[in-house]
Amino acid sequence: LLGGAESNDHNLIRHLNPRCSITSCSSHKLTKDLVDKSDIIIVSNFINVPPEGLVYIQDTKPYIIYEHDHKYVKNRDPSAYPNFIVPESEKVNTEFYKKAKKVFVLSEICKEVLEKNVPSTNVHSIGCSLWSEETFDYIESLLNEQKENDLCILKSSNPIKNYNKSLEYCKENNIVPVELSEPIYQDFLKKMASCERMLFIPGVLETFSRVSAEAKMLGLKLLTTPKRLGFASENIYDQSGADLISSFRARNRAALEAF
């Protein structure tokens, strides 16, 4: 199962491919030659690009940052600091953000936090994750699934998803959760659709939380920590089911055209 950032990137590439010539590569495989051959660069995960590589992009090409996980903070979690104000000593890559033609973020809270910590950055919030129309259709087809189970949690080895903390909550409340870990995306969504509720306890400020949005599109009640959920900062957060699917379809179309 692809993570949220990877799924977003995949859907963006899929949208752009028919419109222009695209070369994609992992950050650790980026070369000067590839930069030189590009007219414009969309930078997503740049964690493995050496500092001199970022400077070269910054100095030679127009570029857009598609921001997923607060790479202007050393620990990649602005929620670790009061009011999301990151100490100067804990900031990184700030010039790279400032010099970008535009920085696309996924939620309003992430726009506010980035602007607060890296002023004069040109930030645009798309207010959503990216899904394909086929995925929206599939989620919609699951709306009438019988809710046979009470509560589900995300089974993930990624520590920021707080799987163990979710298990502790369930144990304390005498709940036997359905654990979502299916590698096939459609199976993952179908299993989620069989539940009444989802528990998700983010360990950091989630830039959006794709899985939380999917739970609400499927009509589940979401138990979470809203202050650490990018999705919760959006004015469609209280929607669910078909209404939320419709809102996300519209936002996805607008987001893709913005690129």
Q: What is each residue range found by the language model?
A:
Residues 40-42, 58-87:
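Active-site proximal beta-strand in glycosyltransferases
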Residues 1-49, 223-254:
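N-terminal pre-catalytic "stem/leader" segment of glycosyltransferase-like enzymes
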